[in-house]
Structure formats: structure tokens, C-alpha cells
């Protein structure tokens, strides 16, 4: 298990490098299999009427066309669910690329879809085309919405707006709300410390090195436990295990302790606790909304935007980039 934890931890620490690598679900436990649209396979639907009827569907007698989207990409069906057709042509291959967060249709009929790694527009040759956007390193999209002819794309840290023909985007950094105190949850602090991301790429590399050290300790420990007949191999493994373990025990304990804290019951206490962000770390950001934005929708009744974040719900005035906390929300 330790070997598996170390290797998987290194890979997850550099997710962008392995996002094109896929593993068939048939090699995973049964709870990871898609059955009856479970596991986030169906996140939402979009009614597109009959305007988007593709050639292969011309003879299908159905009421309206629907797009279904989720962790498996996008699918075309009708209001009777009488068929399901793959609607992913043009999207990059790979499970990460096809985690579709939202699909919308603008008033002018144009259709956009967003995944954590890209924004796509449906158009020429009846397929998806990626929309080029300038993003910060490691920045990921979370949602997309529209009002009138204004397209709004939400990332984990910024709001992007665009007008026809939707080729250029304006990045908006939202102002801090009145109740902003700069504190972060203890859970997030421990999470970033465990991965090393708390100290940027340098911290990640250090944690990767610790994981490699743990791999060496596991291998040398297994060799010593097996007691090979070759005394030279036994002595070498014991020497390495002892020397490396002595010098790295503090770092190894740090990784083990922070990993243990990320699971219940300690995790619950950390989630409910807030502490000041540590100076000199990635948590101390000039952007008060760094890695906090999740969902955005236009509120027709209030004529503003409804913003969901890891800190709660807010009403948003995009023009002024100001937010106001909404207190009357479900617990």
C-alpha cells in the first residue's frame, strides 16, 4: 500500500502531465463502473429543440433534442430518451478532457461547453472547436453561463467575459467581500502542505523527493524482511534503510501525519476551523478569490449574477466586479 500511495501521490502532484493517460474502468473495482448514469455521468441537460438535428437523426420521430453531459462527455438524445448518440466529435480524447462542467446555448443559438481544461464551441462541420484563452498556470475552469449576448466563463480564481464573435476574453478579478478577513480553512492548509503545493513548484518537488525516499525505504525493508541468501544484498539494503530512515524520519512523519489529517474524523475539525493564511505561501494571494469560485448563474429576478464559492453564496455585479454575501441560503 505504501508503494501505491507514493506513486499515486507523485502522479497526482503533476496532474497536467498525465491528463492524457487513461485507464479502463474494467481494471477498477465495480463501484467505479458507470451504471444507470451514476458517478457523475449525467451532470445536466440542455434542451436544444430541433435546430441541431444532425444528419443521422433526420428520420428519427422525436419531440425535441437534448444534450446530456457529465463525466463521460456529451450525448445527444430526445425527450423520450429513445436513443443516445455520441456527441463528442472535436473534443480531445481522455477522461479529464471530457469532464464536462456545463453546456449552454446563447440567445443567438451558439452552443458552448466547458471542461476543467478547455472551453469549446459547437459549429463548423458539426463538431466542437476549442476556444483559445489565456490562463494562469494550473488554472482550471469550473462553469459557464450567459445573459443576452454576453458569455461568462468561470475559473477557480477569475471571471472571464466575452462578446460576439467570442474570440477575445476579458479577465476580471473580483473585489473582496466586506466580510473578507484573509483566513483560510485549516483543512486547505494541511491539504496543500501534504502535496507541497503550499510552497509552489519547489514544495511539490520536495514532496516528490520524500515520496521517492519512502519508496526506497519500502523496497529495502521488503528485501530485509525476505532475508535473501546473498549477504551482500542483505547488508546493503539494511545499511540504506537505516541511514536513509535516520535522516528523513521527520519528513516522512510529516507526510504521514498530514495525510492522516485529511481523513475523518480529524478532517471534519479542520474543515470547520479557519486560520490566517501563512505568509510566503501560495495561500497568501493578492486575489481574495484564489481557487474559490465554483458556479455562476444569472439571476433574472434580481438582475445580477448568483455566484457559488467555497466560502458560500454571493450576488455579483460583473460590471463593477463587486460581490455581496447572501445570508438567506440553505444550511
Model-derived regions: residue spans:
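Beta-propeller fold detector
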Residues: 24, 84-90, 129-135, 168-183, ...
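Extended, hydrophilic extramembrane loops/domains of integral membrane proteins
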Residues: 151-189
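Juxtamembrane amphipathic/hinge helix adjacent to a transmembrane helix
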Residues: 177-195, 217-232
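Repeated scaffold domains used in trafficking and secretory/extracellular systems
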Residues: 36-60, 93-108, 137-149, 286-298, ...
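Juxtamembrane interface at the cytosolic side of transmembrane helices
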Residues: 1, 201-257, 262-264
Amino acid at each position: 500500500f505504501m508503494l501505491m500511495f507514493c506513486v499515486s501521490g507523485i502522479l497526482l502532484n503533476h496532474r497536467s502531465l498525465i491528463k492524457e493517460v487513461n485507464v479502463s474502468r474494467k481494471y477498477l473495482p465495480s463501484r467505479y463502473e458507470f451504471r444507470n448514469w451514476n458517478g457523475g455521468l449525467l451532470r445536466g441537460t440542455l434542451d436544444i429543440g430541433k435546430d441541431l438535428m444532425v444528419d443521422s437523426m433526420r428520420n428519427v420521430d422525436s419531440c425535441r433534442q437534448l444534450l446530456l453531459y457529465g463525466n463521460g462527455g456529451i450525448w445527444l438524445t430526445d425527450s423520450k430518451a429513445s436513443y443516445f448518440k455520441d456527441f463528442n466529435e472535436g473534443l480531445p480524447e481522455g477522461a479529464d478532457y471530457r469532464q464536462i462542467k456545463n453546456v449552454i446555448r446563447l440567445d443567438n443559438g451558439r452552443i458552448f461547453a466547458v471542461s476543467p481544461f478547455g472551453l469549446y464551441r459547437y459549429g463548423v462541420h458539426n463538431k466542437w472547436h476549442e476556444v483559445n484563452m489565456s490562463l494562469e498556470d494550473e488554472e482550471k475552469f469550473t462553469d459557464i453561463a450567459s445573459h443576452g449576448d454576453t458569455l461568462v466563463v468561470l475559473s477557480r480564481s477569475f471571471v472571464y467575459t466575452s462578446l460576439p464573435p467570442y474570440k477575445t476574453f476579458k479577465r476580471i478579478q473580483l473585489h473582496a467581500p466586506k466580510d473578507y478577513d484573509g483566513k483560510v480553512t485549516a483543512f486547505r492548509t494541511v491539504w496543500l502542505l501534504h502535496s507541497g503545493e503550499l510552497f509552489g513548484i519547489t514544495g511539490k518537488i520536495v514532496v516528490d523527493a520524500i515520496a521517492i525516499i519512502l519508496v526506497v525505504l519500502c523496497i529495502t525493508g521488503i528485501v530485509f524482511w525476505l532475508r535473501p541468501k546473498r549477504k551482500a544484498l542483505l547488508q546493503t539494503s539494511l545499511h540504506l534503510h537505516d541511514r536513509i530512515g535516520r535522516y528523513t524520519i521527520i519528513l516522512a512523519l510529516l507526510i504521514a501525519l498530514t495525510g492522516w489529517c485529511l481523513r475523518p474524523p480529524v478532517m471534519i475539525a479542520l474543515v470547520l476551523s479557519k486560520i490566517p493564511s501563512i505568509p510566503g505561501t501560495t495561500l497568501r494571494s493578492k486575489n481574495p478569490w484564489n481557487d474559490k469560485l465554483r458556479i455562476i448563474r444569472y439571476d433574472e429576478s434580481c438582475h445580477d449574477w448568483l455566484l457559488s464559492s467555497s466560502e458560500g453564496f454571493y450576488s455579483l455585479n460583473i460590471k463593477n466586479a463587486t460581490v455581496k454575501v447572501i445570508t438567506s441560503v440553505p444550511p
